Amino acid sequence: MFSKDKLANMEVYNDINGDLVNLFRCVKFHCGELQKELSFMLNSREIFYGFVSQYNTRGMTDIQRAARFFMLIKTSYGSDHRSYGCVKRNVNVMTQYLTDIQERLSNVVIENKDFEDLLKVYDKGDSLIYLDPPYYGTERYYQAQFSKEDHVRLCEVLKNVKGKFILSYNDCEFVRGLYKDFNIDEVQRNHNLMGKYKDKDHKYSELIIRNY
């Protein structure tokens, strides 16, 4: 949604993943320093696994941590950031668009909160809330823990929001049952990971759930 033009008077980005939030904050407030840090990095298997081994190392600055996390995102296979992707990527090309992202984030509030705590602060009658929780049944692939109870808790919280919400989920019986009282649309999406490594389209079903 941040790739679209800014239309709202106020925008809030929230993620429970502290490393992702740190990356966004560094792009917003220290973009030049982050790009400089990244300019010394290479796309290689050895460096990738070096960053993996340093993942929880203390003593790094926020910029150093953000640069390593950025490289793990861009050069990994899948979303676990633990397996090298063997994909040809030019680091300088990857970092060029960070300046555009910095400009886009200039007036965005960046938070690192549990969804329930966040909505207590920002849910208003004129709010439009987009939520992208972990797909049900795939939680082990995410760094931030999200349990079955959290999926249920999210649904209960959304039943009482004042604003409008849009929720994207994987298409499964559990999710359809949980949100049966809301508007559910099924859409087809390209499987970007499969398309990246194979010269063919791979599609899967996703649910778009709304309270309006």
Task: Label each residue range with its predicted role.
Residues 1-9:
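Conserved SAM-binding loop of SAM-dependent methyltransferases across substrates and taxa
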Residues 147-212:
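Long, positively charged, glycine-interspersed low-complexity recognition regions
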